[in-house]
């Protein structure tokens, strides 16, 4: 309901009342009489200038003087200035002098006007105060509720999320199962003398499903779930954060067994005393209150505190000690099997073509986390709806991957034939170098379709399997592949363009990482140069401490330059080797706009030995690759149990 018209009418009546009060007061007090001081009255009496005096019972005194035949002057004397005895003496003297003395009844209206003139302003002030207090204490105001916790409470019957809705983090689920069992049956732990951790910290990159895991624990245990972000505690007023912490924990204890989940706890749990000012602030007071509340738990409380962060290195040590967040669970990005399971979960309830190859999609998305995969499926659903299709097909899902990686296709960006030709040779330079080098990532496809805000085309290379270690030879081959585009421009056109700017930046950074962090320089040896260290609130670019001399810095620069130049020369030699096949490949790419790594390998004569993407599961045919064949965590667990039996 809109309150503005009601407030406007109230304001109108207030203004009208003030106006009438002023008008009435002016009406009854408007006269041209002069208020004279007591001395002037005495002078008029002694000089016998008074010809008439009127005394009102409301205390007013009005007298008329006649200083000449032309005019008379009526004046008022305040009775408070006259004592009763002396005033009566003056009246007697005036009567003796023949002055007309009259006693009259006072003006009652003027009395009420004066009274209202005093009461109405007070009434207006009281009314405005009452109206303001009522508005501030309404449901839409937090003026008097800012000390209450803003945590969202999810009850046990509010569309519970369970472990069946989580995939790709089997180890984390196994660790969290203890928390579920504790919430369901705390006595089972106390019988063995075990103490359930008071706090569980979920650590992992953004989007890996930390919040989803916490909700799944609450759903599995069927207990209330209190969700709050670390930034929700701290407000403008001092002490609000600590008050909200107390209120949150009191609510959780009243609803026990329950779970408190603090997302992004690094917003409030950073190292104390690490701010630029160095002093105590509201954030530290809030953190202290969290520590105190967690110390107040006992085994019978039935409340588990969970938190999530992607910056565990900046958390205060007191927060991580035993008795507080003493259990840390790492939530890693999913592997290829986990990605396939996550894709199936996000495809639930959506009209997906049964022939969709989720294993290929999972292998095309290395490094994707759960949030990325959810976005991928959603993008595919949007594309299917845009094309007026009733089901989501493999084509939409593959295009969605390209949209997530490189942005949407810019079909309206029309390049002239010369620029399109340069882009084609540039991308083929990347691809051919990748095909020829055995340790580079296998080439999956090449396209000259512009995507995103800056990309005019791209070459997609995929690892054949999930990798956790990278060798020096692999890094050098990938470095040469990155510089293959610039090498192709130099050889084919005899000049370079701005298209290789990002390639040079990536190549330089990779070479510097090899020298400074990985000890892969023959000249400088197995030494890590520089140390990442800094205060909590300093920017990332200021956190790398330089612990070497100017001479070493010069040698580092020379070594980085040497690695990049050598990789560039390798790329040039490989492009020159396949120069006779490059023109044919460019014509084919410009015509088709997108070609696979296998097609390019056949054109340049590397069909057998070329390093293009070969599906590791190519021999797995039929329904085993389809979306319906991907197992969820529950199905996988059942399968493991069957194997054990």
UniProtKB/Swiss-Prot annotation:
CC cofactor: Zn(2+)
Q: Which SUPFAM superfamilies match?
A: FtsH protease domain-like, P-loop containing nucleoside triphosphate hydrolases
Q: Which InterPro entries match?
A: AAA+_ATPase (IPR003593), AAA_lid_3 (IPR041569), ATPase_AAA_core (IPR003959), ATPase_AAA_CS (IPR003960), FtsH (IPR005936), P-loop_NTPase (IPR027417), Pept_M41_FtsH_extracell (IPR011546), Peptidase_M41 (IPR000642)
* Bias kind Basic and acidic residues: ranges: 634-645
**What Enzyme Commission number(s) does the record list for this chain?**
3.4.24.-
PROSITE patterns in UniProt? AAA
In its keyword annotation, does this UniProt entry include Protease? yes
Localization: Cell inner membrane
* Residue numbers on the Periplasmic membrane side: 28-110
Q: Name one GO cellular component term.
A: plasma membrane
A GO BP entry is:
proteolysis
- Region described as Disordered: 623-645
Cite the CDD domains for this sequence: RecA-like_FtsH (cd19501)
Can you name this protein? Answer: ATP-dependent zinc metalloprotease FtsH
Identify the species of origin: Kosmotoga olearia (strain ATCC BAA-1733 / DSM 21960 / TBF 19.5.1)
User: Which gene holds the coding sequence for this protein?
Assistant: ftsH
